[in-house]
Amino acid sequence: LREVCGLTTEEIAQAFLAAAPTLAQRIVRAKAKIRDAHIPYQVPEPHELAERLDAVLRVIYLVFNEGYSASSGDSVTRVDLSGEAIRVGRLLVELLPDPEAIGLLALMLLQESRRTARTSPDGELVLLGEQDRSLWNRAQIAEGSALVERSLASRRVGPYAIQAAIAAVHANAASPESTDWSEIVGLYDVLMLLAPSPVIELNRAVAVAMRDGPAAGLALVEGLLERGELADYHLAHAARADLARRLGRTADARVAYERALALARQEPERRFLGRRLAELK
């Protein structure tokens, strides 16, 4: 991520939910290991590709994520990163058509299909439920959906394929109201078995809120925050704030919005959170 893809230490730290100094030390140790073990910089032999695939997929995924939602700066997205991740993802599928490589390409295309609708003409953040779906890229949705089916048909289902299936449910819903939230929660349940993480739990909690109401989702989000793993993750506090707001718990919502605003580093997100906070006041 640092030396090949050019992400900054701060961007990588954000991706791993780690402090930047901690991440910097990991990079120093990794460089020392490469140097001391005389690990060569060369293309792996064909028989070595499969065992290295997971790491390659992870790198492509994290580069795409930084392009899809920039961790800092003046723009919601970075098309240079997401475009490069999709390009490399296509090459990987051609080289090694593994179900998870196919699933990752599907996920990226389905997420990228919403790019134009995710910001207003003046660059402000537009949430999923408020997006103009006529702006979504139907060609990317069709290609991504076909790749999801291809990956799932292999019967070797992994976390990227499941995330792509979730994205396909969103992408193929005609409206926010017609979204099949029960299916999305069920897919998150599968994803939690395959690749459990606090961020996946948070996403599932938001889906539960959409299916069962904000009180059900808020209980899950607050439980996650109490565990401490997402204490410095601004989107967890933003989710808590939104659900509390929808329940009329204005004081709790205000505190959570203030915490999210203090942690957010992307300017459009900060402006969005600031507007929500001002509405409460």
Model-flagged regions — what are they?
Residues 3, 8-11, 18-189:
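Amphipathic helix-loop-helix modules that constitute alpha-helical solenoid scaffolds
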Residues 94-95, 153-154, 190-194, 225-230, ...:
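Solenoid-like repeat scaffolds
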Residues 136, 156, 176, 192-193, ...:
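Structural signature of alpha-solenoid helical repeat scaffolds
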Residues 104, 108-111, 163, 167, ...:
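"A position-specific structural signal for the A-helix of alpha-solenoid helical repeats
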Residues 195-201, 231-236:
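Generic helix N-cap/helix-start motif at coil->alpha-helix transitions
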